[in-house]
């Protein structure tokens, strides 16, 4: 059973949001680590935890936020899969270091909504695939209802066959991929602990020299 923080993600103040960024490994972070699978990627992860920063909103992000509810509702109707829209942070009950915020949650499924410019040719980039795998891992689900809408200059493009601007795919959980992702995250967490221990030792040395 998933554990949900008693707090809506949309209601988080910047201070609390930054604290959560330090406390948990999110789906976005886990996906980036998996794509990189390198020491430099782990350094970026550690740096992000040391000095978390808000991602500045842009037009594309705002459009995605505005269209999210419609995309999920339409994908639910088209697929016949019942989902509830979600704005809460899910924390894995077996390991509270890991968290995710899927856009929707159903009985045995999570849901993720995206928007794409019509010029895009890859509607399932690795970053999104790994992100959904992490969401299924955290929420203990077997599938993800992946819904996306194509637009041209922020005007939805309706598909002639379906009569809808929304498309969907069912993404199955891949435990082998999840295992590899957890391994990458564990390596990054080990590196972060080493950096913290080194920093603590330096602080102790400075303190001892100061009082000597």
Regions found by a protein language model. Give the residues of each.
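Charged, glycine-rich intrinsically disordered N-terminal tails and low-complexity linkers that flank
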Residues: 1-66, 70, 211-212
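A generic signature of intrinsically disordered, low-complexity regions enriched in glycine/proline
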Residues: 24, 48, 107, 176-178, ...
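Short, well-ordered alpha-helical scaffold segments within catalytic/effector domains
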Residues: 68-72, 129-132
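Nucleic-acid nuclease catalytic cores
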Residues: 78-202
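C-terminal accessory segment of soluble enzyme catalytic cores
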Residues: 204-212
């Amino acid at each position: 059973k998933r554990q949900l923080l008693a707090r809506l993600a949309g209601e988080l103040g910047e201070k609390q949001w930054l604290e959560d960024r330090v406390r948990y490994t999110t789906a976005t972070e886990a996906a980036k680590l998996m794509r990189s699978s390198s020491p430099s990627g782990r350094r970026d992860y550690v740096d992000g935890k040391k000095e978390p920063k808000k991602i500045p909103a842009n037009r594309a992000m705002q459009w995605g936020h505005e269209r999210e509810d419609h995309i999920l509702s339409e994908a639910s109707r088209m697929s016949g899969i019942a989902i509830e829209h979600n704005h809460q942070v899910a924390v894995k009950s077996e390991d509270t270091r890991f968290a995710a915020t899927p856009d929707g949650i159903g009985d045995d499924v999570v849901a993720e909504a995206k928007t794409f410019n019509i010029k895009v040719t890859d509607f399932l980039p690795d970053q999104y695939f790994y992100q959904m795998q992490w969401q299924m891992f955290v929420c203990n689900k077997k599938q993800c209802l992946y819904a996306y809408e194509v637009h041209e200059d922020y005007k939805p493009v309706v598909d002639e066959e379906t009569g809808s601007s929304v498309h969907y795919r069912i993404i199955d959980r891949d435990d082998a991929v999840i295992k590899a992702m957890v391994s990458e995250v564990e390596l990054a967490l080990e590196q972060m602990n080493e950096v913290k221990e080194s920093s603590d030792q330096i602080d102790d040395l400075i303190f001892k020299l100061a009082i000597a």
